Amino acid sequence: VPPDEPEPEASVLQGATEGNGIDIVLMGDAFSVQEINDGTYESVMEDVMDYFFDVEPFRSYRHLFNVHMVTIASEQSGYAEGIDTPLQCRYGDGNSITGSDASAFRYARLAVPEERMDEVLVIAVLNSDTFGGTCYMYPPDKGDSANGISVAYIPAVDMKIHLCGLVQHEACGHG
């Protein structure tokens, strides 16, 4: 983290009201300190959370989820050639997005204890209006292959219908 940027920090957007909760960790990439300070970052993360729970069966089971937000500042807003971001997100072929899954999981550990990380869904929101999206899933070493950690990369596209669809497709559908 450059000296003029705040350290990444975790907060809770929603706590499960029943059981231990299923953990989702939201984080952004290429959001500036100004966008964090003016509330843009948190507003985008809250929108993503609401879109996640806007479809069944997630709507009916919302009370079973813990939703965490990890706030990460980038040197600048958005993406430009030659600029590194905390999650190292990049657009690939077609609509694919890559990033540093290891970095995403490292930041997620600020919000979720290590013993709960094996089934976390990370939703990494790119500060970009370029359409795309990809989810990477990692099965656990043991047990049910339907379990495991995953990270969904989704751009914060301007149009609500597109962002909502991306969240539901990548995070709800694949994650």
Question: Which role fits each region the language model picked out?
Answer:
Residues 80-83, 137-139, 165-166:
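Surface-exposed beta-strand edges and their flanking turn/coil or helix-capping segments
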Residues 94-109, 124-161:
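Active-site scaffold of zinc-dependent metalloenzymes
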Residues 2-118, 126-131:
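Propeptide-to-catalytic entry region of secreted or membrane-anchored zinc metalloproteases
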Residues 31, 35-42, 144-171:
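Short pre-active-site segment immediately N-terminal to the catalytic Zn-binding motif
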Residues 23-28, 66-69, 121-125, 150-155, ...:
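Structural recognition of the beta-strand scaffold that forms the well-ordered cores
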